[in-house]
């Protein structure tokens, strides 16, 4: 019964068409990361500058497209590299995310969490967003999330 009521897709994210935009209550994944460009004609050739920019790095693309797939109030839960939250070059994407969603939670996961199973030492975060298109003012945590601040160690 549920397969007739709920959409379940197991295909490349870039292949998901506009027909499913705004249909999901939840988008969850341990997303790929890196500076790999994605070709998604609707994003690469579209009028939205943030969407065009997102196609230049696969992790940013997943966040922007993931939000597009959600219904209003839907949740996005992604495990991602720390670069999404930390890198100054990702500030425009974080700003876009905070303009289109509420920051529900941002958790820094323990170092080496995936080293045994995935063979990677990359630091990871769990980011949970709730879609809210056209929201007004960002709260204090959302404002902090969009900023990159250098911290001296030692």
Which ranges hold each PLM region?
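Flexible loop residues that form catalytic
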Residues: 32, 36, 111, 132
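A solvent-exposed, charged loop/short amphipathic helix patch at secondary-structure junctions
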Residues: 42-52
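Flexible, glycine-/basic-rich loop-and-beta segments that form/coincide
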Residues: 116-154
């Amino acid at each position: 019964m549920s397969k007739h009521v709920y959409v379940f897709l197991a295909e490349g994210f870039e292949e998901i068409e506009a027909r499913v935009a705004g249909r999901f209550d939840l988008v969850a994944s341990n997303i790929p990361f890196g500076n790999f460009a994605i070709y998604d004609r609707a994003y690469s050739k579209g009028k939205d500058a943030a969407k065009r920019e997102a196609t230049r790095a696969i992790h940013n693309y997943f966040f922007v497209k993931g939000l597009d797939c959600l219904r209003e109030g839907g949740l996005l839960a992604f495990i991602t590299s720390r670069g999404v939250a930390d890198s100054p070059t990702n500030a425009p994407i974080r700003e876009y995310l905070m303009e289109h969603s509420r920051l529900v939670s941002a958790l820094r996961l323990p170092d080496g969490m995936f080293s045994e199973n995935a063979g990677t030492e990359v630091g990871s975060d769990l980011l949970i967003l709730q879609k809210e298109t056209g929201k007004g003012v960002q709260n204090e945590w959302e404002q902090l999330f969009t900023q990159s601040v250098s911290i001296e160690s030692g």
